[in-house]
Amino acid sequence: MSVTYDDSVGVEVSSDSFWEVGNYKRTVKRIDDGHRLCSDLMNCLHERARIEKAYAQQLTEWARRWRQLVEKGPQYGTVEKAWMAFMSEAERVSELHLEVKASLMNDDFEKIKNWQKEAFHKQMMGGFKETKEAEDGFRKAQKPWAKKLKEVEAAKKAHHAACKEEKLAISREANSKADPSLNPEQLKKLQDKIEKCKQDVLKTKEKYEKSLKELDQGTPQYMENMEQVFEQCQQFEEKRLRFFREVLLEVQKHLDLSNVAGYKAIYHDLEQSIRAADAVEDLRWFRANHGPGMAMNWPQFEEWSADLNRTLSRREKKKATDGVTLTGINQTGDQSLPSKPSSTLNVPSNPAQSAQSQSSYNPFEDEDDTGSTVSEKDDTKAKNVSSYEKTQSYPTDWSDDESNNPFSSTDANGDSNPFDDDATSGTEVRVRALYDYEGQEHDELSFKAGDELTKMEDEDEQGWCKGRLDNGQVGLYPANYVEAIQ
């Protein structure tokens, strides 16, 4: 494809050779491309840093959530510790990925930004100084040769036109000989025309050859000047290429966690924690604490004593150890004792029978004293288990299906979370957010630094508070993300 040189030399370019007029522009464009490539590399690293940060946050949230679930779940002993080791691994790996993010942005990103600023200098009229210098250098080196090339093209065009005219004159003269109507005078004019065309052909040929010779004589100097400017552009590009290689190697070191001593230690510790799990030890512990190894106050003969105001029958003692936990006690007066969740958990051998006995019989009721009654409050919705229903059944096979997963997000984070402790209401306090927080679960609040909300409950043992936004949304948020409004 032919293009026209924009320096008004009127030369048509028939190839993409560097030596053709105007084809140096690809070399000039490479300078502008270098600046754009610096920006592209910075954007590339910035996106990777965002990914590293998001992954670190997800690991932290995952570890927090599952640490809470495992702590309150039915798993026990050394296997529980091995399971919990994965949460510690996630937290430590999260820290490493945050370090990767910091290295990418603070070291690599800033290094590219500073180099770009030092290597490329913007002009008031737009563009870069380096681009204009290269453009002017090539234009100056090519201008004399392009001028001679223009003369050659003009001489060639004139010579070819003369040759064409000569051929036409000869053709007319040959045709006129066969025409008897032409007089000798007309025939002589045609012959004179042929002679004149031959002279024009000779003159244009000499001029064409002369201009071409002059062009050939100026070509070595043209090539030398163009080569000099091109080498300057090559040196500039070499600096950029070497810099990119250096930066990419540093990025590789920052991303390669296998070379971090702490990374190997994380998985060494994880493996040791898993290998420390001992099924025999866990079974022995469960036998001693929840099985036949437990101590028992076997029934013995007791002498009757008039000083005893209250006695418990064997049946009552059995019920007391069957795991019935009272959540409310109504006394004879208007006074009532607050409910207190049990700190221990006893699994009844027959839950249905125990529940029936609990509702129909009070083990602390004095058989002789009709003035005092002890009963459960029917309207109390407090749970008698502090964390997890130990008697619930689990599916035989583990499944990713949320409907069969006892630790699914619906159960673990929704309103029916079996691990949630009873909420205890407190005095509402207005607080202000210190940092931005984006809720990771549907029961968590999202807010920006400076937003105000209402704290409804004090911080729990996991570091979370219950609060309400001004739009009425109620949920959980990290306690250390806010401060009380003075």
Curated annotation (Swiss-Prot):
One of its GO terms (cellular component) is caveola. Residues 11-282 form the F-BAR domain. Phosphorylated by casein kinase 2 (CK2). Phosphorylation by PKC probably decreases the membrane binding and tubulation capacities of PACSIN2, thereby modulating the lifetime of caveolae. CDD domains: F-BAR_PACSIN2, SH3_PACSIN1-2. GO terms for biological process: actin cytoskeleton organization; caveola assembly; caveolin-mediated endocytosis; cell migration involved in sprouting angiogenesis; cell projection morphogenesis; cytoskeleton organization; modulation of chemical synaptic transmission; negative regulation of endocytosis. Residues 426-486 form the SH3 domain. SMART domains: FCH, SH3. A motif (NPF3) lies at residues 417-419. GO terms for molecular function: cadherin binding; cytoskeletal protein binding; identical protein binding; phosphatidic acid binding; phospholipid binding; protein-macromolecule adaptor activity. The keyword Membrane applies. The keyword Ubl conjugation does not apply. Residues 1-362 are annotated as: (Microbial infection) Interaction with HCV NS5A. Residues 25-274 form a coiled coil. It is a peripheral membrane protein. Keywords: Acetylation, Cell junction, Cell membrane, Cell projection, Coiled coil, Cytoplasm, Cytoplasmic vesicle, Cytoskeleton, Endocytosis, Endosome, Lipid-binding, Membrane, Phosphoprotein, SH3 domain. Residues 348-363 have a biased composition (Low complexity). It is found in: Cytoplasm; Cytoplasm, Cytoskeleton; Cytoplasmic vesicle membrane; Cell projection, Ruffle membrane. Its main location: cytoplasm. Residues 327-347, 383-396, 404-416 have a biased composition (Polar residues). The modification N6-acetyllysine is found at K53. The modification Phosphoserine is found at S273, S313, S399, S446. Homodimer. May form heterooligomers with other PACSINs. Interacts (via NPF motifs) with EHD1 (via EH domain). Interacts (via NPF motifs) with EHD2 (via EH domain); this interaction probably stabilizes the caveolae. Interacts with EHD3. Interacts (via the SH3 domain) with MICALL1. Interacts with RAC1. Interacts (via SH3 domain) with DNM1, SYN1, SYNJ1 and WASL. Interacts (via F-BAR domain) with CAV1. Interacts with TRPV4. Forms a complex with EHD4 and MICALL1; the complex controls CDH5 trafficking and coordinates angiogenesis. The F-BAR domain forms a coiled coil and mediates membrane-binding and membrane tubulation. Autoinhibition of these functions is mediated by an interaction between the SH3 and F-BAR domains. The F-Bar domain also mediates the binding to the cell actin cytoskeleton through the interaction with CAV-1. (Microbial infection) The SH3 domain is required for the cell-to-cell spreading of HIV-1 virions. Belongs to the PACSIN family. This is Protein kinase C and casein kinase substrate in neurons protein 2. It comes from Homo sapiens (Human).
